[in-house]
């Protein structure tokens, strides 16, 4: 998959940052010395951490060089490291008080081992806070798979849906963490985002979920694929009374705290 596009991602920054705010609001820490943003993207969520914990060492982790460059420009006082969450671990003696993963772990596989490993990396009393989109069965994502299965695109796209991991059920995450945590808080929210048009919905998902489908296509095939996808979106999201479309966006939240 090609590198991420920070400018495209930021076009819907308010909508993307809202769940980051709501995740952070449930983090039961009054202070922290070291906080880590796993999958920091362009730094919108990292900025929330820096404001919430002034004076803390703030570290952002991401695989994307473009996203990290954008984050460094936004937050020059923070530390940003290019690394894969699947292999990342804190340095000895640098266990974080907060591991914060907003809309990133859905791109990392092996949650049955990943989640307990991240939790074990926390300092005593530390918190693991996770938010993940739970929208694979929404029309926005079903339509991606349906169009990708059609000729002439299916051979080039292949199994693009496999790039994003199949997340577990919310009760499964509770079961992973409850035996080892002091407390576990889980909840599920479906946001309803008013969107100006079907094209606006396509633009939103082009910055994230649609990338694995579009990137493998030859340049000559991309416009046709996107046009077919937009027709599917137009049919799936009817115009509401004010002329807008409502994009339902389910998200899962997990906040677990270690014993002191």
Swiss-Prot record:
EC identifiers of the protein: 2.1.1.144
Catalysed reactions, as listed in the record: trans-aconitate + S-adenosyl-L-methionine = (E)-3-(methoxycarbonyl)pent-2-enedioate + S-adenosyl-L-homocysteine
GO biological process: methylation
CDD domains: AdoMet_MTases (cd02440)
NCBIfam families, alphabetized: PRK01683.1
Family: Belongs to the methyltransferase superfamily. Tam family.
Protein name: Trans-aconitate 2-methyltransferase
Gene: tam
């Amino acid at each position: 998959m090609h590198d991420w596009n920070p400018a495209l991602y930021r076009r819907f920054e308010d909508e993307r940052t809202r769940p980051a705010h709501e995740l952070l609001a449930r983090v039961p820490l009054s202070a922290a010395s070291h906080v880590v943003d796993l999958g920091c993207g362009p730094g919108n969520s990292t900025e929330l951490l820096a404001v919430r914990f002034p004076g803390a060492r703030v570290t952002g982790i991401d695989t994307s060089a473009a996203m990290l460059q954008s984050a460094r420009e936004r937050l020059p006082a923070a530390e940003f490291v290019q690394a894969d969450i699947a292999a990342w671990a804190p340095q000895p003696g640098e266990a974080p008080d907060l591991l914060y993963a907003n809309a990133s772990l859905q791109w990392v596989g092996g949650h049955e081992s990943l989640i307990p490993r991240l939790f074990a990396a926390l300092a005593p009393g530390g918190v693991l806070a996770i938010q993940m989109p739970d929208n694979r069965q929404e029309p926005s994502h079903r339509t991606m798979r349906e169009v990708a299965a059609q000729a002439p695109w299916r051979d080039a796209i292949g199994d693009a849906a496999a790039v994003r991991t199949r997340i577990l059920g919310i009760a499964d995450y509770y079961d992973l963490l409850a035996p080892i945590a002091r407390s576990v808080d889980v909840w599920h929210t479906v946001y309803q985002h008013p969107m100006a048009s079907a094209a606006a919905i396509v633009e939103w998902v082009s910055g994230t979920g649609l990338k694995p489908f579009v990137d493998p296509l030859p340049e000559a095939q991309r416009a046709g694929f996107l046009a077919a996808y937009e027709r599917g979106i137009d049919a799936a999201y009817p115009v509401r009374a004010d002329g807008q479309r409502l994009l339902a966006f389910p998200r899962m939240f997990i906040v677990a705290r270690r014993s002191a």
